[in-house]
Curated annotation (Swiss-Prot):
Subunit structure: Interacts with HscA and stimulates its ATPase activity. Interacts with IscU.
Its job: Co-chaperone involved in the maturation of iron-sulfur cluster-containing proteins. Seems to help targeting proteins to be folded toward HscA.
InterPro entries reported in the protein's UniProt record: DnaJ_domain, HscB, HscB_C_sf, HscB_oligo_C, J_dom_sf
Organism this protein belongs to: Klebsiella pneumoniae subsp. pneumoniae (strain ATCC 700721 / MGH 78578)
Stretch forming the signal peptide: none
GO terms under cellular component: iron-sulfur cluster transfer complex
The protein, known as: Co-chaperone protein HscB
GO MF, one annotated term: ATPase activator activity
Annotated keywords: Chaperone
Family statement: Belongs to the HscB family.
Gene: hscB
Length: 171
Protein backbone atom coordinates (compact mmCIF):
# COMPACT_ATOMS: atom_id res chain seq x y z
CA UNK A 1 0.00 0.00 0.00
CA UNK A 2 1.43 3.37 -0.95
CA UNK A 3 1.63 6.23 1.55
CA UNK A 4 -1.13 8.27 -0.08
CA UNK A 5 -3.53 5.33 0.13
CA UNK A 6 -2.47 4.67 3.73
CA UNK A 7 -3.55 8.22 4.61
CA UNK A 8 -6.68 8.06 2.45
CA UNK A 9 -5.43 10.83 0.18
CA UNK A 10 -5.17 11.08 -3.61
CA UNK A 11 -1.68 10.44 -5.00
CA UNK A 12 -0.95 14.09 -5.73
CA UNK A 13 1.81 16.54 -4.87
CA UNK A 14 -0.75 19.13 -3.85
CA UNK A 15 -2.41 18.07 -0.63
CA UNK A 16 -3.77 19.55 2.56
CA UNK A 17 -1.11 19.38 5.27
CA UNK A 18 -3.88 19.89 7.82
CA UNK A 19 -5.78 16.88 6.49
CA UNK A 20 -2.53 14.89 6.40
CA UNK A 21 -1.86 15.75 10.07
CA UNK A 22 -5.38 14.77 11.13
CA UNK A 23 -5.10 11.42 9.32
CA UNK A 24 -1.65 10.85 10.86
CA UNK A 25 -3.02 11.41 14.37
CA UNK A 26 -6.00 9.13 13.68
CA UNK A 27 -3.75 6.35 12.39
CA UNK A 28 -1.32 6.75 15.29
CA UNK A 29 -4.18 6.45 17.79
CA UNK A 30 -5.53 3.42 15.97
CA UNK A 31 -2.22 1.55 15.59
CA UNK A 32 -0.09 2.80 18.48
CA UNK A 33 1.91 -0.16 19.86
CA UNK A 34 0.77 0.59 23.44
CA UNK A 35 -2.76 -0.39 22.42
CA UNK A 36 -1.43 -3.86 21.65
CA UNK A 37 0.57 -4.37 24.87
CA UNK A 38 -1.60 -7.28 26.02
CA UNK A 39 -2.04 -8.77 22.52
CA UNK A 40 -0.13 -11.82 21.30
CA UNK A 41 3.49 -11.20 20.25
CA UNK A 42 2.64 -11.44 16.54
CA UNK A 43 0.02 -8.68 16.87
CA UNK A 44 2.44 -6.53 18.88
CA UNK A 45 5.08 -6.90 16.18
CA UNK A 46 2.54 -6.08 13.45
CA UNK A 47 1.46 -2.96 15.38
CA UNK A 48 5.08 -1.80 15.77
CA UNK A 49 5.73 -2.34 12.06
CA UNK A 50 2.50 -0.60 11.04
CA UNK A 51 3.27 2.32 13.36
CA UNK A 52 6.76 2.60 11.84
CA UNK A 53 5.24 2.64 8.34
CA UNK A 54 2.79 5.36 9.41
CA UNK A 55 5.66 7.44 10.82
CA UNK A 56 7.74 6.98 7.66
CA UNK A 57 4.76 7.94 5.49
CA UNK A 58 4.14 11.03 7.62
CA UNK A 59 7.79 12.14 7.38
CA UNK A 60 7.79 11.57 3.63
CA UNK A 61 4.50 13.26 2.74
CA UNK A 62 4.76 16.29 5.01
CA UNK A 63 7.93 17.64 3.36
CA UNK A 64 7.58 19.01 -0.20
CA UNK A 65 10.76 17.53 -1.70
CA UNK A 66 10.39 14.07 -0.19
CA UNK A 67 6.71 14.07 -1.17
CA UNK A 68 7.67 14.87 -4.78
CA UNK A 69 10.39 12.20 -4.75
CA UNK A 70 7.94 9.65 -3.37
CA UNK A 71 5.28 10.56 -5.95
CA UNK A 72 7.87 10.17 -8.70
CA UNK A 73 8.92 6.79 -7.25
CA UNK A 74 5.34 5.62 -7.78
CA UNK A 75 5.90 6.38 -11.47
CA UNK A 76 9.22 4.58 -11.78
CA UNK A 77 11.69 7.34 -10.83
CA UNK A 78 13.63 6.28 -7.74
CA UNK A 79 15.43 9.56 -7.02
CA UNK A 80 16.36 8.59 -3.47
CA UNK A 81 18.82 5.89 -4.53
CA UNK A 82 19.79 6.97 -8.01
CA UNK A 83 23.23 8.03 -9.13
CA UNK A 84 21.81 10.31 -11.86
CA UNK A 85 23.02 13.89 -11.62
CA UNK A 86 21.97 17.20 -13.09
CA UNK A 87 23.37 17.66 -16.59
CA UNK A 88 22.22 21.23 -17.10
CA UNK A 89 25.55 23.06 -17.39
CA UNK A 90 24.04 26.53 -17.00
CA UNK A 91 22.26 25.46 -13.82
CA UNK A 92 25.43 23.89 -12.41
CA UNK A 93 27.44 27.03 -13.19
CA UNK A 94 24.79 29.13 -11.45
CA UNK A 95 25.06 26.84 -8.40
CA UNK A 96 28.85 27.22 -8.33
CA UNK A 97 28.52 31.00 -8.52
CA UNK A 98 25.93 31.02 -5.74
CA UNK A 99 28.16 28.81 -3.54
CA UNK A 100 31.09 31.16 -4.14
CA UNK A 101 28.92 34.14 -3.27
CA UNK A 102 27.79 32.44 -0.06
CA UNK A 103 31.42 31.75 0.86
CA UNK A 104 32.30 35.41 0.26
CA UNK A 105 29.37 36.51 2.42
CA UNK A 106 30.53 34.19 5.19
CA UNK A 107 34.09 35.46 5.05
CA UNK A 108 32.89 39.07 5.11
CA UNK A 109 30.34 38.31 7.86
CA UNK A 110 27.89 40.51 5.97
CA UNK A 111 24.43 40.05 7.57
CA UNK A 112 22.60 42.38 5.19
CA UNK A 113 24.05 40.74 2.11
CA UNK A 114 23.22 37.31 3.53
CA UNK A 115 19.61 38.33 4.10
CA UNK A 116 19.29 39.34 0.44
CA UNK A 117 21.03 36.15 -0.65
CA UNK A 118 18.60 33.99 1.34
CA UNK A 119 15.64 35.83 -0.20
CA UNK A 120 17.06 35.33 -3.68
CA UNK A 121 17.65 31.59 -3.12
CA UNK A 122 14.12 31.24 -1.73
CA UNK A 123 12.73 32.95 -4.83
CA UNK A 124 14.76 30.62 -7.08
CA UNK A 125 13.48 27.63 -5.09
CA UNK A 126 9.85 28.82 -5.20
CA UNK A 127 9.99 29.43 -8.96
CA UNK A 128 11.45 26.01 -9.62
CA UNK A 129 9.01 24.38 -7.19
CA UNK A 130 6.07 25.88 -9.10
CA UNK A 131 7.54 24.49 -12.32
CA UNK A 132 7.74 21.07 -10.65
CA UNK A 133 4.12 21.32 -9.48
CA UNK A 134 3.04 22.05 -13.07
CA UNK A 135 5.14 19.17 -14.39
CA UNK A 136 3.69 16.74 -11.85
CA UNK A 137 0.17 17.94 -12.60
CA UNK A 138 0.79 17.38 -16.33
CA UNK A 139 2.36 13.97 -15.59
CA UNK A 140 5.65 15.08 -17.15
CA UNK A 141 7.51 12.65 -14.89
CA UNK A 142 10.95 12.90 -16.52
CA UNK A 143 10.92 16.70 -16.47
CA UNK A 144 9.61 16.73 -12.89
CA UNK A 145 12.39 14.33 -11.82
CA UNK A 146 14.97 16.67 -13.36
CA UNK A 147 13.41 19.64 -11.57
CA UNK A 148 13.46 17.78 -8.24
CA UNK A 149 17.17 17.09 -8.73
CA UNK A 150 17.70 20.84 -9.19
CA UNK A 151 15.52 21.63 -6.19
CA UNK A 152 17.78 19.44 -4.06
CA UNK A 153 20.72 21.70 -4.96
CA UNK A 154 18.73 24.80 -4.07
CA UNK A 155 17.47 23.24 -0.84
CA UNK A 156 21.03 22.41 0.25
CA UNK A 157 22.14 25.92 -0.66
CA UNK A 158 19.28 27.39 1.36
CA UNK A 159 20.20 25.19 4.34
CA UNK A 160 23.83 26.28 4.10
CA UNK A 161 22.79 29.93 3.98
CA UNK A 162 20.51 29.49 7.00
CA UNK A 163 23.32 27.76 8.92
CA UNK A 164 25.60 30.67 8.11
CA UNK A 165 22.90 33.06 9.29
CA UNK A 166 22.69 31.24 12.64
CA UNK A 167 26.47 31.29 12.94
CA UNK A 168 26.60 35.03 12.23
CA UNK A 169 23.82 35.72 14.74
CA UNK A 170 25.70 33.81 17.44
CA UNK A 171 28.86 35.73 16.69
Amino acid sequence: MDYFTLFGLPASYTLSLEQLAVRYQDLQRQYHPDKFASAPAAEQLAAVQHSATINQAWQTLRHPLTRAEYLLSLHGFDLASEQHTVRDTAFLMEQLELREELDEIGQAKDDARLEGFIKRVKALFDTRQQLMVDQLHNESWEAAADTVRKLRFLDKLRSSAEELEEKLLDF
